[in-house]
Amino acid sequence: MRILLVEDHPQLAASVSQALKNAGWTVDILHDGVAADLALGSEDYALAILDVGLPRMDGFEVLARLRARGKTVPVLMLTARGEVKDRVHGLNLGADDYLAKPFELSELEARVKALLRRSVLGGEQQLRCGDLVYDLDTRRFTLLDESLNLTSREQAVLEAMIARPGRVMSKEQLASQVFGLDEEASADSIEIYVHRLRKKLERGSVRIVTFRGLGYLLEATSG
């Protein structure tokens, strides 16, 4: 899953990004509101972490513009402002959660998981497709009750597919979940990851189906 982090303090951005990457997420870092507004308008994120006090365009305006476009991506606001009126303002604009600075990285990670659990899993702890199970808190896939050994890229592809049941995902859509803004997104490499995943899933009652010219679908099999 791909997360956008918008924070103008370089050291804080680096530490938060590293913590999220260590937890297994793909993270894009931006440092101003205009860049964030552009990215949120063109990229597909599972979650946005948005500082209020951004240069060029503050976090409140970025959030307001995001919701005005009809985007429902969950947003966690970071703020050094402790006033209730600021938190209320952000929540009224469409923020999903607030975290006041300074904060512990463990609390931020817990809030990220809670937001993703609500938005991706509908409040559930796990997603299932056949005998493939994904646990959001541990970010582990199991097949027939055995842990799957996946690379970070394979994990990102499989997360994207299991989070969108019944939906055919194009190579470009999958690539957007695998590669960050500072990486060259390769749709062709998705074929390689899908091939590897098929090998790892073949003993279970789940498969990745190819729809030529459209993309891939993760589905349970009857046998």
Language model feature labels by segment:
Residues 1-123:
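N-terminal/domain-start alpha-helical segments
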Residues 24, 165, 205:
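Short glycine-rich hinge loops at helix-strand junctions in the catalytic core
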Residues 106, 172, 188:
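Residues within helix-turn-helix
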Residues 122-126, 149, 192-194, 198-223:
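DNA-binding patch around the recognition helix
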Residues 153, 186-188:
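N-terminal positioning helix adjacent to the helix-turn-helix/winged-helix DNA-binding module
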Residues 157-158, 174, 197, 201:
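DNA major-groove recognition helices of helix-turn-helix
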Residues 177-182:
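Short helix-coil junctions and helix-kink-helix linkers
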